Amino acid sequence: MGDIKAEIKGIGINIPERILTNFDLEKFLDTSDEWITTRTGIKERRIAEEWEKASDIALPAAKEAIENAGLTPKDIDAVIVATSTPDMTFPSTACFLADKLGSSKPMAFDISAACSGFIYGLTLANSFIKSGQFENILVVGAEVFSQIIDWNDRSTAVIFGDGAGAVVVSKSDGESDILSAVMKSDGSHWGSLYCPVGEKLRMRGRETFKLAIKSMETASKKALQKAGLTLEDIKLVIPHQANIRIINALAERMELPEERVYSNIHRYGNTSAASIPIAFYEAWKEGKIDKGDHILLTAFGGGLTWGAIVLKF
């Protein structure tokens, strides 16, 4: 059992077609493109159709990830969906997704860890694979934050977007592996970022900013230590795409050059649990990472939750 490795075998994303630019927001909010860009780095974000639910936007991403892995939905043993915008309170979005995929009755459940949800899910998939319980697990981050945004609140309406990203984590006897994971939470800071049932998202931006940088830096260093690696061994750091100021501050604290920290927040805004798989996919497509590279993923989110993963792609 100790020789089992867990590799990311396939990746897929789904980005809604509708684009909402900063100039569009100027038409109904007391804001401007300059104000938004300077404070967040965001130029535009994608918005799902009103009828679309998390499982709907997750489906194309999941299909692409499974196809890229050279598998079929019938090969998937478990489906884990990280989302803060589930289809329903229950059943889980993962159950809806598994059914839409035509999977063979896999274990299916959701994770509610806000923007940290995807790396929480990846950590669980890693453990399930290495325990020998499963061989192929679909991990998805899918969000339709446009449905829980107060569009009159410029502090949050300018930040969030919709999207989905998915990976297939599979048993492997090759070199690829999830090497280490550090996952944490602190419920005493719940008021920094939260969404009451049936209401809209609320955020204390300044408090969130400070907590985000410190938590991601600490988790990243611990994950590297557990993996027996240093930052010099890491090809690319892929942080949660929350705010360009947070990303830049993290890079500065970790003494990393800009080219080794991936960012696509200008195109999509903050897509919460979907941000890391979307960024991972685009970095791969752009040739910034390749098989055999060491990658560091790190995120923070409401809860507060945070964590980091080191993997060999």
UniProtKB/Swiss-Prot annotation:
Active-site residue list: C115, H240, N270
Stored Pfam families: ACP_syn_III, ACP_syn_III_C
Superkingdom per UniProt: Bacteria
Region ranges (ACP-binding): 241-245
GO molecular function terms noted in the UniProt entry: 3-oxoacyl-[acyl-carrier-protein] synthase activity; beta-ketoacyl-acyl-carrier-protein synthase III activity
Assigned GO CC terms: cytoplasm
Cleavable signal peptide: none
Keyword Cytoplasm: yes
Principal subcellular localization: cytoplasm
Pathway noted in the entry: Lipid metabolism; fatty acid biosynthesis
Entry keyword Acyltransferase: yes
Location in or out of the cell: Cytoplasm
Domain notes: The last Arg residue of the ACP-binding site is essential for the weak association between ACP/AcpP and FabH.
Function comment: Catalyzes the condensation reaction of fatty acid synthesis by the addition to an acyl acceptor of two carbons from malonyl-ACP. Catalyzes the first condensation reaction which initiates fatty acid synthesis and may therefore play a role in governing the total rate of fatty acid production. Possesses both acetoacetyl-ACP synthase and acetyl transacylase activities. Its substrate specificity determines the biosynthesis of branched-chain and/or straight-chain of fatty acids.
HAMAP family: FabH
Protein family (similarity comment): Belongs to the thiolase-like superfamily. FabH family.
Subunit composition and interactions: Homodimer.
Descriptive protein name: Beta-ketoacyl-[acyl-carrier-protein] synthase III
Originating species: Persephonella marina (strain DSM 14350 / EX-H1)
Gene from which this protein is expressed: fabH
